[in-house]
Amino acid sequence: ETELHEICKRLGHELTERYEDNVLPPVFIGVMKGALPFMMDLIREVECPILTDYVTISSYMGKESTGVIKLKKDIDTDLTGRDVVIVEDIIDTGVTLEWFKEYLKNNYYPKDISICVLLDKKCKRKMEIYRLTQTKL
C-alpha cells in the first residue's frame, strides 16, 4: 500500500503541475469498476480544481476479451474545450482505451486527452500510451 501511495503522490504532483493553470478544470474519467480505488487515491493527491466522471465499458466476458466494445454507462460532463484524463487500473492491449479516446474526441470535443494507468501490461499492446512517469511494479 505504501508503494501505491507513493505512485499516486508522484502522479498527483505531475498532474497538478500540468493542469494548475487551466482556466477550465480538467475532467478525470474513471473506467469502472476496476479504476475506482486507484482513481480515488489519485485525485486525493491532485492539488488543483478538477471534475470527475466515470464510464462503464465492457469488452470482456469473464477473463477473455470478446472483441466487442460496449459502452454501458456514458459520461455526464460537458468536455468541450477541457483537458481530459482517462484513469484506468490496468492497460492490456489498449484497444478499449483507444476506442474510448476516439469516442470522446468524436462526440465530446475535448481540448486534449491523456491516459493515466496504474499497471501497464505491455504483452499485447496495440496502441501507444503517453507516460507521465515510468513506473515499474
Tell me what each language-model feature is.
Residues 1-137:
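PRPP-associated nucleotide enzymes
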